[in-house]
Amino acid sequence: MSRINNKATQLLSAMILAGLACHSMAADSIRIGIAGAKTGPVAQYGDMQFSGARMAIEQINAKGGVDGKQLVAVEYDDACDPKQAVAVANKVVNDGVKFVVGHLCSSSTQPASDIYEDEGIVMITPAATSPELTARGYKMVFRTIGLDNAQGPAAARYIAQLKPTNVAVLHDKQQYGEGIASSVKDILGKEGIKVAMFEGINVGERDYSSILAKLKQANVDFVYFGGYHPEMGLLLRQAKEKGLTARFMGPEGVGNDSISQLSLIHISEPTRPER
């Protein structure tokens, strides 16, 4: 998940100006939808997104707004749930909002973006990393974050440098987690690193003893997990309880203050391909 920085602020302003050329707006203000997870298991990332978008709007307004108009935030909660995201997107349409910062999770961003594209609504996601999102030729969909197919290879090359004996690649069966895990697995194979296991776990499950027993039986010494911090936290805690000494690694979705303080964990971030 990325912070909205000056570049994102500039992009937001540019997109609004481009939109103004297409839409006749007589109002003194421009409503900006902010769509993401206010509730649900990854609400902490949603809080970062909402805070960053609010800050960008404040900064733009402090400089006179866009085309002399002040920006007004309209906030929507999709809980990172695809069905709720579709409901949010339809509400955005019904509310007459023409610009959206969001959504957060790839699995909720993609179905929402279909609606925005059809309705001519500009959408900028600061967090959805699935390559599929911007590979469909859509004209109204943008992002300010890197792609899983760039982060995955970078993570795999880092793992290869550590020279593990047996690697397990786990994921949460979601678009974001499984996508980046698949990328890691593919590159590890090309790097000559044995992937002993590639399996999905169920989001929201409280007991991962079965998968951890498999890891231990396979003598896994390194685990890459594609997903978010709630599941990673449980995996780490239960692995320690069962005496599993493997090192763990995950993408930015597992970044969390409490998890980052635990030993034997590496966290990667979205990145650009090496040139």
Language-model features, listed with the residues they occupy:
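Beta-alpha junction/loop-to-helix N-cap segments that form part of ligand/metal-binding clefts
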Residues: 44-51, 59, 63-138, 144, ...
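Short helix-capping segments at alpha-helix termini
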Residues: 60-68, 118-121, 188-194, 240-245, ...
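Gram-negative bacterial Sec-dependent N-terminal signal peptides
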Residues: 2-25
